């Protein structure tokens, strides 16, 4: 499956993204990569951020960029936020994870299960969050949180995914809420999976996990095991995923990215209209 890895970053996040991009290549992942940044990166096809797309704090800009990318000739588009790091090449290809479904994000932790210990997600009480999902069309018995930093979309589903994500934004705003994009991403994984259990995070702990508690604080992941805590249940497990969402390693990733750019200064941006040929190596 022809796959494009893509991301968007600005400010210090572009240095984190530079560190991520190098880690992807260093472990031997060969999929094409496209970035949108406020200054060029090195070692990847780098386009300037689209000034027509508002980089809103709640990050619904991700859906606008997804819609923008649908003109590119790829089968699968994999979004990875800048504060990630690859410690080895994943055993499963991205195409193996998405399977036959049009969309994937890891459904991490149950919101309305006997295992649930946390009383809210994004400040919304669990019962109210479940009701919000139900009102939008989610009908699975158990509803799960997700992480908005890593997800995949097939090309034929991109326009519908973007439309649905932005529709959910408006839906929850009409309910008096101001939730970030990852709630919409969770909704998509519930609604558009033939078997949503194939999205459950526990099936992919060796591929990806989010380090949000600070056990790797200010350190770049190095392939060692670390203690993962599931957000809603607070259950812990020792993990060593190939891809770490290193949420508490930002300062180390910034410094790493700066050093990479000093050693290998970036070239100019690739104009968006030339991105396809640049990715093809023409």
Can you say where each PLM-predicted feature lies in the sequence?
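Long, compositionally biased intrinsically disordered regions
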Residues: 226-282
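A conserved donor-nucleotide-binding helix/loop in the catalytic core
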Residues: 50-80, 86-92, 103, 146, ...
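Catalytic core and acceptor-binding pocket of nucleotide-sugar-dependent glycosyltransferases
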Residues: 133-249
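Non-transmembrane alpha-helical segments in soluble domains
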Residues: 21, 25, 95, 162, ...
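Short His-Asn-centered micro-motif
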Residues: 6-10, 35-38, 80-82, 88, ...
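Conserved donor-nucleotide/metal-binding helix-loop-beta segment in metal-dependent transferases, i.e.
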Residues: 86-127
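Short, solvent-exposed loop/turn segments at secondary-structure junctions
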Residues: 10-12, 39-42, 84-86, 109-112, ...
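N-terminal anchoring/stem segment of glycosyltransferases
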Residues: 1-61, 68-75, 156, 191, ...
